[in-house]
A protein has these predicted regions:
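Conserved beta-strand/loop positions that form the S-adenosyl-L-methionine
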Residues: 51, 74
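Short beta-strand element of Class I
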Residues: 69-72
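Conserved short alpha-helix immediately C-terminal to the canonical SAM/SAH-binding motif I
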Residues: 80
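Conserved SAM-binding loop
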Residues: 84
């Protein structure tokens, strides 16, 4: 199991839809898409956050059902986020992204009024 986890951590670094930034780097440099998520998504669609998204199943399902919205899943566990990031990459989904960080850090990822909804589904 640990071997798979290390492989997933390594693969996480290759996903364009999975953002992993150290707390120190976030404090020092900020997040490159803060206030500019529309540039990453390539549209001005509303953004919904899912906090504690785990494997990203809910974000992926909603992104499939609502291609006119953008979804961002947050979780601290990289091995879990791997599943969602991999699925979204395999399906070439452009309306879903994932961020690996602690929940209390989310304000550093968004400008005021950049997020339409925040969901906690557990």
């Amino acid at each position: 199991m640990a071997h798979h986890k290390l492989e997933r951590f390594a693969e996480n670094l290759t996903f364009a839809n999975l953002f992993q930034i150290s707390f120190e780097q976030l404090e020092r440099e900020g997040f490159e898409y803060r206030g500019r998520w529309s540039e990453w998504f390539g549209n001005e669609a509303p953004i919904t956050l899912e906090l504690g998204c785990g494997k990203g199943d809910y974000c992926i399902a909603l992104a499939r059902m609502h291609p006119d919205r953008n979804y961002i899943g947050f979780d601290i566990k990289g091995a879990r986020l791997w599943r969602g990031a991999k699925t979204a990459t395999e399906e070439a989904m452009r309306n879903v992204a994932f961020v690996r960080t602690r929940i209390e850090m989310i304000d550093r990822f968004f400008a005021e009024r950049e997020v339409s909804e925040i969901w906690i589904t557990f």
